[in-house]
């Protein structure tokens, strides 16, 4: 409740900032809101915003990127505070208020029709991802519920990876083309890594199951990962907020992931609002990627699908995913 309350405040604050900062960010956040509406997973929205701002950034160029960066920076700042996690979910929650504002942002995006329409087209294309991601999300949520503690471990990874993703967010765009290749590699490698992770640990099994599910879900993995991360991130966040004590399974894991979450995101925003654009997306991705594999593959592939739209986000992450998968294969899955 505190987390959600704070996230409500945070969500209100950043959004207030968003419209005040830019109707463009609102355009994209409006798209993201549309994504949120469509996604109900802020992660997908963010992925939507990422692919929106990725493709929109392709269309709107720096504008969507700037808006995403702004929102990403805001989110990334909040996420640096770990608020983005709450905020992302808060955004998920606020997606309604975000929808309101986002509708304003949508109207704004409509005001910027080219952007707005590209936003909508992206949001729609993302919406397809969202929808597929939503189905996958539900599947993965069920798997999540099954995997329970896997969330936390995965979230740790997600945090870590989201960190790498923040860092790599810059490179996502560069390697968007790579993403698909890597993404496929992930999918191939990741089941392997999933098995390896299974070998590595029961977490691995969980991660593996989720990841394998992710493999299928991976194109939607971002969506799944995001929604799962949301739930997972919600749990770890709450646990992080609650001291992750209730998460006795991995209070350290969730706490560390919270700390990591906070730490890397702080560097990420400091690194770049671009990484925040991606990290904002990736924050969403992180949230979504509570499974690092999902994040990596999820944001990679989900963003990969959306990142196929975003062209980028997951690309480097996909490389990372491959690398991580190699690490996972090395059983350094918890190499963080």
Curated annotation (Swiss-Prot):
Localization of this protein: Cytoplasmic granule
Free-text description of this protein's post-translational modifications in UniProt: Filaggrin is initially synthesized as a large, insoluble, highly phosphorylated precursor containing many tandem copies of 248 AA, which are not separated by large linker sequences. During terminal differentiation it is dephosphorylated and proteolytically cleaved.
GO cellular component assignments: cornified envelope; keratohyalin granule
Compositionally biased spans, kind Basic and acidic residues: 100-120, 163-176, 184-195
Expression sites (tissue/organ): Expressed in the granular layer of the epidermis (at protein level). Expressed in the epidermis of the ear (at protein level).
Location of the region described as Disordered in the Swiss-Prot/TrEMBL record: 1-313
Keywords: Developmental protein, Phosphoprotein
Gene Ontology MF annotations: keratin filament binding; structural constituent of skin epidermis
Segments of skewed composition (Low complexity): 16-26, 40-66, 73-98, 285-311
GO BP annotation list: epidermis development; establishment of skin barrier; intermediate filament organization
Subcellular location, principal: cytoplasm
Transmembrane segments: none
Record's function text: Aggregates keratin intermediate filaments and promotes disulfide-bond formation among the intermediate filaments during terminal differentiation of mammalian epidermis.
Family: Belongs to the S100-fused protein family.
Protein known as: Filaggrin
Origin species: Mus musculus
């Amino acid at each position: 409740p505190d987390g959600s309350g704070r996230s409500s405040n945070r969500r209100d604050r950043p959004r207030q900032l968003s419209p005040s900062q830019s109707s463009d960010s609102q355009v994209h956040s409006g798209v993201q809101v549309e994504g949120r509406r469509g996604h109900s997973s802020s992660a997908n929205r963010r992925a939507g915003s990422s692919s929106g701002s990725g493709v929109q950034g392709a269309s709107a160029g720096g504008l969507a990127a700037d808006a995403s960066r702004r929102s990403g920076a805001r989110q990334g700042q909040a996420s640096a505070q770990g608020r983005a996690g709450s905020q992302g979910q808060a955004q998920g929650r606020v997606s309604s208020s975000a929808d309101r504002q986002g509708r304003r942002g949508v109207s704004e995006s409509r005001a910027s029709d080219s952007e707005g329409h590209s936003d909508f087209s992206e949001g729609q294309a993302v919406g397809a991802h969202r929808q597929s991601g939503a189905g996958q999300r539900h599947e993965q949520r069920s798997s999540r519920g099954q995997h329970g503690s896997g969330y936390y471990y995965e979230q740790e990874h997600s945090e870590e990876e989201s960190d790498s993703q923040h860092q790599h967010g810059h490179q996502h765009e560069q390697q968007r083309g790579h993403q698909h290749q890597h993404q496929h590699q992930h999918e191939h490698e990741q089941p392997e890594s999933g098995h390896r992770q299974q070998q590595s640990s029961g977490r691995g099994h969980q991660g593996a199951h989720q990841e394998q599910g992710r493999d299928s879900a991976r194109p939607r993995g971002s969506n799944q990962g995001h929604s799962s991360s949301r739930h997972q991130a919600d749990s770890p966040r709450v646990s992080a907020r609650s001291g992750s004590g209730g998460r006795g399974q991995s209070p350290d894991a969730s706490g560390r992931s919270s700390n990591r979450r906070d730490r890397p995101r702080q560097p990420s925003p400091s690194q770049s609002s671009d990484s925040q654009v991606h990290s904002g997306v990736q924050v969403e991705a992180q949230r979504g990627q509570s499974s690092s594999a999902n994040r990596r593959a999820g944001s990679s592939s989900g963003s990969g699908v959306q990142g196929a739209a975003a062209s980028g986000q997951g690309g480097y992450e996909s490389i990372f995913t491959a690398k991580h998968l190699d690490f996972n294969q090395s059983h350094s899955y918890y190499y963080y």
